[in-house]
Design a protein with these regions (language model features):
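Short, structured active-site "lid" loops
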Residues: 19-42
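Mid-chain, well-packed structural core segment of small domains
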Residues: 38-39, 44-84
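Short secondary-structure boundary/capping elements
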Residues: 16-20, 61-62
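Short, well-ordered secondary-structure micro-motifs
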Residues: 15-18, 48-49, 91
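A short beta-strand-loop structural module common to alpha/beta enzyme folds
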Residues: 2-14
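Patatin-like phospholipase
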Residues: 2, 29-30, 123-124
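C-terminal binding/interaction regions
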Residues: 64-124
Length: 124
């Protein structure tokens, strides 16, 4: 199993998603969390917030295939879901696919290394 830290909202009222996205993304960036899962209406805002943090590779996934590919090819460490577009059953399948899929490495590692180099250069 895995340890779960719920850093989400506690109600139905509208909130500022960056305030919540930063909690998970900062945890992944610092190494405190191995992975994170974020949800907002479209998923776009949370993905933008999370990808501001060094070492975070957030992927907005709307289906199981993109969830698997984001892990296999990109070693994504933050999954972002679109709450308005994803029903609970589909969300469960996406999360399961994402959690169970390993990074393939190989040619994909070379590409990740290039992304890390770019990130180091730009985040000084």
């Amino acid at each position: 199993g895995c340890r779960l830290v719920d850093a989400g909202t506690r109600g139905e009222e509208s909130v500022d998603y960056p305030d919540f996205g930063v909690l998970a993304a900062e945890g992944v960036s610092s190494g405190r969390f191995e992975r994170g899962i974020l949800v907002c209406g479209s998923g776009v805002g949370m993905a933008i917030v999370a990808n501001k943090f060094p070492g975070v590779r957030a992927a907005l996934c709307l289906d199981e295939e993109t969830a698997r590919l984001s892990r296999q090819h990109n070693d994504s460490n933050v999954l972002v879901l679109a709450g308005r577009k994803t029903d609970p059953d589909t969300a469960g399948r996406i999360v399961r696919a994402w959690l169970e899929t390993p990074f393939e490495g190989g040619r994909h590692q070379k590409r990740l290394d290039k992304i890390r180099e770019l990130e180091q250069r730009l985040c000084k």
